[in-house]
Amino acid sequence: MLDYRSSAKDALILLCDASSPMHVKQEACSESGEEESVSMTPFEMAVKVAHATLRNKVFHAPNDLVGVILFGTTEAVGVSDFKHISQLLPLDTAEAQHILRLEEFLDDARKFKEEFGGSSGDFSLHEAIWQCQSMFANIKGKTGQNKIMLLTCVDDPHASAAPKKRHAMAKATDLNNTGIYLDVVPIGKGFKMDKFYKDLVQLADDEHPLDETPGAERIEDLLRVTRKRIHKKRSIGRVR
């Protein structure tokens, strides 16, 4: 089926987990099979993905929109309706100042705590998704594909909070009804999609097979995975 929106600008929100586990360096398996320390924390890897994405958009898709939302921050910065959710970058075309802002967080790990107050586990994922929906709704003009790419190393964020889990699943169904795609990219080894995110993604998109690529342990692997998924176009088969 033809995708009549393929020539329009796309909109992408990188929804990055900023909770405490994201700021702890993990270990990865070396080529010899031995474990070795990874130089970047999962959060730094997520910011690096955002940085690489913006640089790519500048040269190859300057009309596309990219934003970065954090969930699991102590403060709510740039977001007025929800607690523990912050806007790192607005949903806008890629600009040099946005790239430089991301570099500040990559160059100085203290920048995160200074600006967002540190991490908090008392967030609601459905509110983070809701914030993304609101940003898409405020876009002026038509867009092609609207996508949320969620990056996290935590495979069951609401393990002890059943109501929050139910709310997240309901919000995922809402994404399905509004044509917003949700893609979850795991970071680190041992990530089990079937604990939580498998159901979430399938509720958000019941027409395409779930990508169950194992969690990326190194930044080069994560960049390769995210680059492929960002560029992947979905055929338009649903009537909205």
Where are these regions (language model features)?
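A short, compositionally biased domain-edge/stem linker segment
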Residues: 1-2
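Von Willebrand factor
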Residues: 5-98, 147-151, 182-189
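Context-gated lysine
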Residues: 9, 25, 48, 57, ...
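Exposed acidic/Ser/Thr-rich ligand/metal-binding surfaces
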Residues: 10-11, 16-19, 72-81, 104-181
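Glutamate identity and glutamate-enriched acidic tracts
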Residues: 27, 31-36, 44, 75, ...
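Low-complexity, intrinsically disordered regions enriched in charged/polar residues
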Residues: 82-85, 93-100, 194, 213-217, ...
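An alpha-helical interface "stripe"
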Residues: 91, 99-108
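Eukaryote-biased recognition of electropositive, low-complexity segments
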Residues: 156-240
